[in-house]
Amino acid sequence: MKLIIVLVMMLVCVYSMSIEKNIPKNHEVPAKKQFAETKVEKKKRSDDGDEEICDDDDEDCEDVVDIEECNEDDDDCVDGGETEECDEDDDDCQEEKKKKKRETKPKLKKRNDDEEEEECEEDDEDCEVEVDIEECDEEDDDCYDEDKKKKKENKLKKESKKKNSKKTVPKNAKKSSKRSTSTKKTSQKKQQDKRGAIQKNLKIKEANFKKKFNLNF
């Protein structure tokens, strides 16, 4: 009887141990799994309508703010906001719109000035010196004068560049012709020296031959 009781106790112990192995404890759950569960809970909460608030220690969580970036050509668009449309009768709105347009233009100009300007070499005919030409309003007379001045400067620079390129071409041609004539002269002189040396050697050989055999011609 005691033996049966001991066997039953052993079976109960083994069964309880197997149950404990199959059921993991909370602290034994991997950290990634817990993090994934919290993310799912947060997503579910945001889907329900609640805004997601990030903890200070949570590096992966970010408060996302959608910022609309504007193109350079879109004058009506302002960075960080939607395009503002004004009514025709609303003068204040139109003035505000013009003010924003004036503020954005210097920013774009500064960005362009920060870029490196390409400098042309004297021999490079394809390269052209560019001058920035600002677009003028119809009512601004001073701007028109400045615009014409810049265009004139650009034209003069292009013409002077073309003249310089034309001058350099004949100079290079003269140099090449001088080089060719000098090379021809040197080659002719070398040939003459070579012939003279050959004739001299022949005369010396002939004199030695006569001395050897005491021949008189």
From Swiss-Prot:
Sequence repeats lie at residues 32-81, 98-147. Residues 32-147 are annotated as: 2 X 50 AA approximate repeats. Residues 24-47 have a biased composition (Basic and acidic residues). Residues 48-58, 72-94, 114-145 have a biased composition (Acidic residues). Residues 1-16 form the signal peptide. Residues 24-58, 72-205 are annotated as: Disordered. Expressed in tentacle-specific epithelial cells (battery cells) as well as in a small fraction of ectodermal epithelial cells in the gastric region subjacent to the tentacles (the tentacle formation region). The later cells are committed to become battery cells. Induction: By PKC. Coiled coil: none annotated. Residues 98-110, 149-188 have a biased composition (Basic residues). Keywords: Developmental protein, Repeat, Signal. Responds to early signals of head formation in hydra. This is KS1 protein. It comes from Hydra vulgaris (Hydra). The lineage of its organism: Eukaryota, Metazoa, Cnidaria, Hydrozoa, Hydroidolina.
